[in-house]
A protein has these predicted regions:
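Extended amphipathic alpha-helical interaction segments
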Residues: 1-81
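A cross-kingdom marker for long, charged
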Residues: 67, 71-143
Length: 143
Protein backbone atom coordinates (compact mmCIF):
# COMPACT_ATOMS: atom_id res chain seq x y z
CA UNK A 1 0.00 0.00 0.00
CA UNK A 2 2.83 2.37 0.89
CA UNK A 3 4.53 1.73 -2.47
CA UNK A 4 1.31 2.47 -4.36
CA UNK A 5 0.89 5.71 -2.40
CA UNK A 6 4.51 6.71 -3.07
CA UNK A 7 4.16 5.96 -6.80
CA UNK A 8 0.98 8.02 -7.07
CA UNK A 9 2.49 10.82 -5.01
CA UNK A 10 5.59 10.93 -7.21
CA UNK A 11 3.54 10.92 -10.42
CA UNK A 12 1.26 13.72 -9.22
CA UNK A 13 4.21 15.83 -8.03
CA UNK A 14 5.95 15.43 -11.39
CA UNK A 15 2.81 16.56 -13.19
CA UNK A 16 2.26 19.55 -10.88
CA UNK A 17 -0.86 18.14 -9.20
CA UNK A 18 0.39 17.65 -5.64
CA UNK A 19 -2.90 18.72 -4.10
CA UNK A 20 -4.64 15.74 -5.69
CA UNK A 21 -2.89 13.54 -3.10
CA UNK A 22 -4.63 15.48 -0.35
CA UNK A 23 -7.99 15.14 -2.08
CA UNK A 24 -7.50 11.39 -2.56
CA UNK A 25 -6.72 10.87 1.11
CA UNK A 26 -9.61 13.10 2.14
CA UNK A 27 -11.97 11.19 -0.15
CA UNK A 28 -10.80 7.87 1.25
CA UNK A 29 -11.45 9.03 4.80
CA UNK A 30 -14.91 10.34 3.91
CA UNK A 31 -15.79 7.06 2.18
CA UNK A 32 -14.53 5.01 5.14
CA UNK A 33 -16.61 7.14 7.51
CA UNK A 34 -19.62 6.77 5.24
CA UNK A 35 -19.27 2.99 5.28
CA UNK A 36 -18.87 2.95 9.05
CA UNK A 37 -21.86 5.19 9.64
CA UNK A 38 -24.18 3.68 7.03
CA UNK A 39 -23.27 0.00 7.03
CA UNK A 40 -21.63 -0.82 10.36
CA UNK A 41 -23.72 1.43 12.63
CA UNK A 42 -27.26 0.27 13.31
CA UNK A 43 -29.30 2.96 15.10
CA UNK A 44 -31.86 0.35 16.19
CA UNK A 45 -29.19 -1.86 17.75
CA UNK A 46 -26.13 0.33 18.41
CA UNK A 47 -22.86 -1.54 18.88
CA UNK A 48 -20.57 0.15 21.42
CA UNK A 49 -17.44 -0.89 19.50
CA UNK A 50 -18.70 0.68 16.25
CA UNK A 51 -19.69 3.86 18.09
CA UNK A 52 -16.25 4.00 19.70
CA UNK A 53 -14.50 3.59 16.33
CA UNK A 54 -16.62 6.36 14.80
CA UNK A 55 -16.01 8.61 17.81
CA UNK A 56 -12.25 7.99 17.75
CA UNK A 57 -12.13 9.40 14.23
CA UNK A 58 -11.98 12.83 15.87
CA UNK A 59 -8.21 12.23 16.12
CA UNK A 60 -7.90 11.13 12.50
CA UNK A 61 -9.89 14.16 11.37
CA UNK A 62 -7.50 16.45 13.25
CA UNK A 63 -4.55 14.77 11.51
CA UNK A 64 -6.28 15.00 8.13
CA UNK A 65 -6.92 18.72 8.56
CA UNK A 66 -3.27 19.23 9.45
CA UNK A 67 -2.18 17.23 6.38
CA UNK A 68 -4.44 19.22 4.05
CA UNK A 69 -2.69 22.47 5.10
CA UNK A 70 0.12 21.38 2.77
CA UNK A 71 -2.20 21.95 -0.20
CA UNK A 72 -3.87 25.27 0.61
CA UNK A 73 -2.73 26.64 -2.74
CA UNK A 74 -5.59 24.63 -4.29
CA UNK A 75 -9.03 26.26 -3.88
CA UNK A 76 -10.74 22.85 -3.97
CA UNK A 77 -8.68 21.71 -0.98
CA UNK A 78 -9.52 24.94 0.85
CA UNK A 79 -13.22 24.44 0.09
CA UNK A 80 -13.33 20.90 1.47
CA UNK A 81 -11.10 21.82 4.40
CA UNK A 82 -13.78 24.31 5.45
CA UNK A 83 -16.36 21.52 5.23
CA UNK A 84 -14.18 19.23 7.35
CA UNK A 85 -13.64 21.98 9.92
CA UNK A 86 -17.41 22.31 10.19
CA UNK A 87 -17.62 18.55 10.77
CA UNK A 88 -14.88 18.84 13.40
CA UNK A 89 -17.19 21.09 15.42
CA UNK A 90 -19.39 18.03 16.03
CA UNK A 91 -16.41 15.90 17.04
CA UNK A 92 -15.26 18.63 19.44
CA UNK A 93 -18.51 18.37 21.41
CA UNK A 94 -17.43 15.23 23.27
CA UNK A 95 -14.42 13.83 25.07
CA UNK A 96 -12.75 10.42 25.03
CA UNK A 97 -11.04 9.18 28.18
CA UNK A 98 -8.65 6.24 28.12
CA UNK A 99 -7.86 4.21 31.22
CA UNK A 100 -4.32 4.52 32.54
CA UNK A 101 -2.18 1.77 31.02
CA UNK A 102 -4.83 0.88 28.42
CA UNK A 103 -3.60 3.18 25.67
CA UNK A 104 -0.77 1.97 23.44
CA UNK A 105 0.84 4.39 21.01
CA UNK A 106 2.64 2.91 18.01
CA UNK A 107 4.85 5.76 16.82
CA UNK A 108 6.13 3.77 13.85
CA UNK A 109 2.67 3.19 12.40
CA UNK A 110 1.31 6.36 14.01
CA UNK A 111 -1.72 4.66 15.55
CA UNK A 112 -3.40 4.53 18.94
CA UNK A 113 -4.61 1.20 20.30
CA UNK A 114 -6.97 0.77 23.20
CA UNK A 115 -9.17 -2.05 24.40
CA UNK A 116 -11.81 0.46 25.40
CA UNK A 117 -12.48 4.04 26.31
CA UNK A 118 -14.99 6.12 28.16
CA UNK A 119 -16.57 8.80 26.05
CA UNK A 120 -19.15 11.50 26.43
CA UNK A 121 -20.61 11.29 22.93
CA UNK A 122 -24.40 11.56 22.85
CA UNK A 123 -26.82 9.99 20.41
CA UNK A 124 -27.65 13.47 19.09
CA UNK A 125 -24.00 14.29 18.33
CA UNK A 126 -23.53 10.88 16.71
CA UNK A 127 -26.58 11.47 14.51
CA UNK A 128 -25.24 14.91 13.52
CA UNK A 129 -21.90 13.38 12.53
CA UNK A 130 -23.64 10.64 10.56
CA UNK A 131 -25.87 13.14 8.77
CA UNK A 132 -23.03 15.47 7.88
CA UNK A 133 -20.84 12.61 6.62
CA UNK A 134 -23.72 11.47 4.40
CA UNK A 135 -24.18 15.01 3.05
CA UNK A 136 -20.44 15.52 2.51
CA UNK A 137 -20.03 12.19 0.74
CA UNK A 138 -22.95 13.01 -1.55
CA UNK A 139 -21.34 16.33 -2.42
CA UNK A 140 -17.96 14.74 -3.14
CA UNK A 141 -19.32 11.88 -5.24
CA UNK A 142 -22.12 13.77 -7.01
CA UNK A 143 -20.91 17.39 -7.34
Amino acid sequence: MQKAYNDIDQHLRQSGRESTVGLIIMGGWIEAMYLATQLAYDPLDPDAVVIQKIAEQKYTLTSLLSFLKNYYDDPVVVYYTKKLKYLKNYFDQYEIYFEKGDLEIDYGKQVLRSSGANMTITEDILEQIIGYIHKLRSEVTFP
